[in-house]
Amino acid sequence: MKHLSIIALLACISLASTPVLGSEKISDKELLNKVKTYDGYTREVRRHLHHYPEVGGKEIETVRYLKERLHEIGQFEIHNVPGSTGFYAILDTHRPGKTIGLRTDIDGLPVTESPINGEGKPKPFISKHKGFTHGCGHDGHMAILLTTIHILYDWRSKLNGKYVFLFEEGEETNTGIRPMIAAIKHIHFDAIYGNHLASNVPSGHVYIKDGAIMAGMAMLSWQVFGRGGHASRPDMAINPIFAATNILNTVAIAWNSQRDITKLVTLGITQFHGGETWNVIPDSTYIGGTLRFFDWEAGVRSLELIKKVATDVARAHNCSVRFGESMTAQVPPVINDKKLATFARQSIEGLYPGHTTSDESYNWYASETFALYNQLAPTLFTLVGVQNPELGTTAGHHTAAFDIDEDALQYGIGAMLKFATSNLHLAD
């Protein structure tokens, strides 16, 4: 009995002196060194994806490539998203802890890429898919997330909780977000993080702020119907072009007199089509465009104002209006959780001193489907600067000349890793 007691005591001492898996703190130095060791991998992934962009709903080869790289890294639960080409993967440490979502978008744009960048310099490589490009940086987003996954997998014995990696298709067309939300709504997330490369932010800087960081979006799409006829007898027709132009003029007046001007909403009319030849009055005209806003209610009210003006002015011209099904407020502003933003700003500034900013001038009027993830959990979205005039990476997103400074990708990876690993230890 005495010998058994000694053995039991020694066993208890041994267990007490053994580090508990998942409790090790990852130092900033270790994190930065790890990111550096994967620099070649990050660039390789980004360049492959840049060569072969695919648009929303058709990212077949992109998804195949991403899943192949995940299988090379290790074992994950991989789930396809029903009704979508998107998917998500889970890394479960099987230890108690928080559940963190990390997201990337995966689609490209139907734009022919220019071999010349924003400063007139030749790009080192361009898309091999003619007519398509990663002109918004989604290739970089995927490279950031894959590298982050690789490092988290390497560190899995040091971590607690669960990571869910979200590969969202069709961000540009808003087609992938709702199927993704439906597919993951059963998961209890503690936080969801995403980032976006930004050509308006200096390379090597990470923009972090609480509140609205990217704009909400409403689509404009309507037809004005009159009665066509021969151009020589306009009195025998009802010309919808006059009605349509008066609608736009009246909207411009109402914009200043019937809206709360303290809440900025930008109005972009981008399409005006009517008629096919010079001597025929058309039956209809088409107007299209977009609204962008940082206040959801202001955006909705502005959309309703346009509909009212269009209906009333068309009626005054004996015309009618038909609004497109897509003419709705589709995406809310991206709103960062204050607690997460404060935490991230402090921890990422500690990782990259002098490389974080909260300057309001970097607010981006583009829209992001990431906004909808706040239906599931508190969210944080950061902008990673890629603007480098010396390299020529200054062109705006969605342009043929768009390019990125690949050196900036390390900051995106570091910020994502710092958030993901530190956030698991946040007290509730």
Pin down the residues of each PLM region.
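Acidic/His- and Gly-rich active-site-bordering loop/insert found
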Residues: 24-134, 139-160
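Metal-dependent amide/peptide-bond hydrolase catalytic core
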Residues: 24-26, 245-428
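Divalent metal-coordination and catalytic microenvironments
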Residues: 49, 89, 102, 138, ...
